[in-house]
């Protein structure tokens, strides 16, 4: 319903928040990556179609965000191990970005009419690596898949992160994620 309003006023800005996962699929997150790839494709098409109407579409591709969201994310299989990986990764300084910093980068990109914004994140190098060396990148991701938890556990059933706690999570390793969960009302 927003697009007709933008057309009537003769301009507009649309921001679609996808993910670095919409540019590079990673093991154990394939449904997530598929949805983000679809959003990136939709945004690219909209950007091309709407530019002539002075409506700019920006696609934001953040990496890991330290928001505390793993507490409410859904995990399957060996849910405790999966949750541990995500909650620790969400807490590593320099790997995960806080929401305010990401929001400022997205807002800046929108204001300047940029087509895509890759929120500063160490994982962004995998996008360029994939484009230059697709086979090497796939081999590296296959190695990563081997260190992630195997299938099993609760099978197709699902558990939320807070139902998947273990000795490692919560722990001192997940302090930043725990703080972010409180700050962002994820508790």
Task: Please provide the spans of the model-predicted regions.
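Residue(s) in the substrate-gating loop at a strand-loop-helix junction
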Residues: 19
